[in-house]
Amino acid sequence: YFSSFSDSWLAHAKAYVDMIADRFHLNEKSKVVEIASNDGYLLKNFVARGIPVLGVEPAANVAEVAKKNGINTKVAFFGERTALDLTNDAWSADLIIGNNVLAHVPDLNDFVKGLKILLKPTGLITMEFPHLLQLMEFNQFDTIYHEHFSYFSFLAVEQVFTRHGMKLFDVEE
């Protein structure tokens, strides 16, 4: 699956980058890491602003497309080990992005521990994920796929991040 085939998703990615870069004053001294970065569809918008990026993408064929498009990409599944490797390579992040990745994670605690390791003390993480309550309330069962390990409520996600020493400060629907 290549995210860049969806015009509406590309527009969403551009709007997100414009908002987050302006709101948190990201610049050429910032470092942005996207987990499950796909073909670089989102990170290319940071690159256009001169902001250093790194994608972490487990699918080698998809990561190769990102690399061909000039997006610095590491082929790996993200978790504590990958985060330690990246910090050893001087890739502590001002911003970590995870869009629609939580459902694919087999060990949520290892994943969130990795986020905490990779994040600079003053950095922030943004996560987009399907909300379990909306899935049930609006009968969105067509969003359930066999490759998803879990679907989370907002409360469950908040508790996991809190347990790993991170504080939630903004939510959008």
Regions inferred by a protein language model and the residue ranges of each:
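A short glycine-rich, Lys/Arg-flanked "PGG" loop and its adjoining helix->strand segment in the class I
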Residues: 109-124
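A conserved beta-strand element that flanks and buttresses the S-adenosyl-L-methionine
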Residues: 94-97
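Extended interfacial segments that mediate partner engagement and assembly in macromolecular machines
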Residues: 1-61, 65, 145
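Glycine-rich phosphate-binding loop signature in dinucleotide/nucleotide-binding domains
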Residues: 26-27, 87-91
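Short catalytic micro-motifs in class I SAM-dependent methyltransferases
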Residues: 99-101
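Conserved SAM-binding strand-loop segment of SAM-dependent methyltransferases
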Residues: 70-85
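Conserved S-adenosyl-L-methionine
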Residues: 166-173
